C-alpha cells in the first residue's frame, strides 16, 4: 500500500469544452472549407482530364453532410474539414487532390478567378477516418459537398481551454476513498504502487512543461501542431492537466509516462483541424511505441458540436486508444458539445470536495462519470517547481485519464480495449453519492477501488 500526503489537500485534474472563450472552458477551432462537384480524376481526356459526373450523397450513409456548422459563431473564414466515406480507399487520395487542383486551375483560367486554395492537413486515423483540411473558396466547397466520395464538409472552428483560477487543492484523496472525505482522509491518497507503470498518457492540450521536477523525466515532447508555435507550454493548462495524470506529487498514476501533443496556442485557442491532427499523431505514435503496454489520451478541450472531431475520436478509440474528455463548463447539456458527446469516450463532469456537483459542470446523459474538478492544485509553468490551483471539468478529466492508466497497470488485459476499460471503470465507480445531480445525469464518481 502507498499513501501520499500533500500539504493541505489532494487534487485531481479535469478539462471541459466550449465554443466561445470562457475562463471555464478549453475550446479550439480553425475552419477549413472544401467542396467538389465532379467526382474522380480518371485520367487524360480531350482537355487532359476526364471527370465523372457526381451522384447525390446517399442520406442513408452513416456520416451526413454537416451544413449546420457553417453558421457557427467561431467558424474560421473559408477553412473546412473534409471527410471521405468509409468505402473510399486511401489509394484514391492523391488523384482526388489532383482533381481539386485541376478544378482550381480550370476555374482560374475560365473565370480569371484568383480564389483561395490551401491544403493544411491530411488525416488518416485507423480504417475509419480519412480526410483533409484547408482553406478553400466557397465555389470549391459547394463542389466538394456534391462529390459522391465525400461524407462530410464541416467548417473548421475555434475552441478554447476551459478553466477558472481558484484557491486551494484537494482531489486525489477523493478518488481513493469510498466515503465522503473527512478531517483524517482529506489529504490521504491510497493507491497501488504500480500506479500507471508501463502506460503512456498523451496530453492533447497546450503542451507540457516537461522539465518540471514533478514529472521526474517521464514527460517528453511529442508534437507541435499549430504553425508558428514552439515546443513550450506558454499557457499552463496542459502542464496542470499532466500533473494530475502522472505527477509525482499531484498525479493519480505516478509512474506513467507523459507525451505532450500541443494543439492549442498560448491564448488557449486552437482549431478543430489542428486537434484532429493531434489525435492522429497520438494514435500513430501509440502504435509505434513498443515499450508501453498501452496508451491513454486526455483531451480537456471542447466546443460546439463537431461531427469531424467526434469521428476522429471514435476512430482512435476503435483503434485501441482510451479517451478521457471534459464534459464542459457551461452548466448545460454535454450532448451539445464535442468531443463530450462521443459515446465511447469517457466524458467527465466535475465534483467538489464535499461531494456536490460543481456549479459550472455540464450535465446530461452524455456525462459518464464525475471526478474532482474544483480547486485543484497541480503543476504549472514558469519554473520547474511551479504549481497552480484551477477549477473546471478540464481538471476532472485528467483524474479519469490517470485512473485509466492506473487500472491498465494493475490489469494489462485491459490494454488496447478502451470500451471494455470504460465499462470496468464504471463498474467500480461510486454510485449515488453526489448531491445536486439532475435525473438525466449519471450519479457516478471516479474511484480507484483501493479500499
From Swiss-Prot:
InterPro entries: PCSK9_ProteinaseK-like (IPR034193), Peptidase_S8/S53_dom (IPR000209), Peptidase_S8/S53_dom_sf (IPR036852), Peptidase_S8_Asp-AS (IPR023827), Peptidase_S8_His-AS (IPR022398), Peptidase_S8_Ser-AS (IPR023828), Peptidase_S8_subtilisin-like (IPR050131), Peptidase_S8_subtilisin-rel (IPR015500). SUPFAM superfamilies: Subtilisin-like (SSF52743). The keyword Metal-binding does not apply. Residues 80-161 form the Inhibitor I9 domain. GO terms for cellular component: extracellular space; fungal-type vacuole; fungal-type vacuole lumen. One of its GO terms (molecular function) is peptidase activity. Residues 169-451 form the Peptidase S8 domain. Residues 1-20 form the signal peptide. GO terms for biological process: protein catabolic process in the vacuole; zymogen activation. It comes from the Eukaryota. Its EC number is 3.4.21.-. The active site is at residues 205, 237, 394. Gene3D superfamilies: Peptidase S8 propeptide/proteinase inhibitor I9, Peptidase S8/S53 domain. Keywords: Hydrolase, Protease, Serine protease, Signal. It holds the Pfam family Inhibitor_I9. Belongs to the peptidase S8 family. This is Subtilase-type proteinase psp3. It comes from Schizosaccharomyces pombe (strain 972 / ATCC 24843) (Fission yeast). The lineage of its organism: Eukaryota, Fungi, Dikarya, Ascomycota, Taphrinomycotina.
